[in-house]
């Protein structure tokens, strides 16, 4: 950048809360105290407003096509917020229930494991990176399934959409092992 001028950033202002969230979570063992403060916290407020805008626009686009899809857009935004908030208020719950999101924040590669509520899209995109056996979900859908079905699904996933592994050990993963 030029001396005396602000550095140009292609990141929109609204993304500053996202990157601040990532910094906070890395420093506080996956906790995000902004969720404790609630709507008074600028990052939490920005997340809620952003989700509301996206859900409202998507719902409006889907409404003429399908009222069910319109409701699904609203539900998905609310579910995302609930899961994401709970994960960062209860890290132990997150490690057990949504380990892919824990990996997203605490893994050495934060450009992996983008999904929050379910990991299946990361498998399709090839962005699921598992950092420790304790942080591997039962199956790529991220839901509890009977063992035989989960094993079959894991076999299919490994053949067509294999997850990547990293060697970096995480403190929580070591404690869980």
Task: State where each predicted segment sits.
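Membrane-embedded catalytic scaffold of the fatty acid hydroxylase/desaturase
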Residues: 1-146, 152, 156-157, 161
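Membrane-proximal intrinsically disordered regions of secretory-pathway and membrane-system proteins
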Residues: 153-176
